[in-house]
Regions:
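Secretory-pathway/membrane protein signature
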Residues: 1-208
Length: 208
């Protein structure tokens, strides 16, 4: 379920990028945007190297420690959303189950990281296979609770494209959208439970 977002941004002296216009063309890119397609080539080389490591490293190179900082940010954002909402009951919504699940996931992620390091040191094939299976599968826990309200196709409990934010994601979308978009505190309570459950499933997959 993991995905990758890779892109190149303009520098301060670069020409304007005619995004989604008739001037967004091969001619513009070849003459102005990336003359010689140097950036394109480097990005292709990087992706090739990344794919090589994902396929050939003894352990899939995922940095589970990144989840700790990101989940802390997601929780802080949710708390701010709830405290600033005019929806009756939002400021007092009980998210303790979610906080407990996040803490448990962070603990399991650290234990899985330690187990992966020990497996690498030992070179034990069975242990390496077990670790890789966990790293491959744990994201499935985040999609284990059914689709989001009114858009069943989106199933991830940690983030999803916003209903009206274009490419920008919404974190803890089931809870956040229940409050911000639907004004439904009962739905928010339901998705606190579902979100916590999805995180627990992911943590259970990671558990050594």
């Amino acid at each position: 379920m993991a995905s990758l977002d890779l892109g190149a941004g303009a520098g301060p002296e670069d020409p304007i990028y005619h995004y989604h216009s008739s001037y967004d063309s091969y001619h513009w890119m070849s003459e102005f945007g990336d003359v010689g397609f140097i950036t394109h080539r480097v990005m292709g080389e990087y992706l090739t190297l990344l794919a090589y490591h994902l396929a050939d490293d003894p352990i899939i190179p995922f940095d589970l420690s990144n989840y700790e900082s990101e989940l802390d940010i997601y929780l802080a954002d949710l708390e701010e959303t709830l405290s600033s909402s005019d929806l009756e009951g939002a400021a007092n919504l009980d998210i303790s189950a979610l906080q407990t699940s996040v803490a448990n996931f962070i603990d399991m992620a650290q234990r899985a990281t330690d187990y992966a390091a020990a497996a690498m040191d030992s070179g034990n094939e069975e242990a390496l296979h077990l670790v890789n299976g966990k790293l491959r599968d744990f994201h499935r826990g985040f999609t284990s609770q059914g689709g989001l309200p009114n858009r069943e196709f989106f199933r991830h409990v940690l983030f999803a494209p916003g209903l009206d934010t274009g490419y920008a994601p919404v974190t803890f979308p089931g809870i956040t959208e229940a409050v911000v978009e639907y004004g439904n505190i009962t739905m928010a309570e339901e998705w606190v439970v579902k979100t916590a459950a999805g995180i627990d499933v992911a943590a259970g997959i990671l558990q050594p």
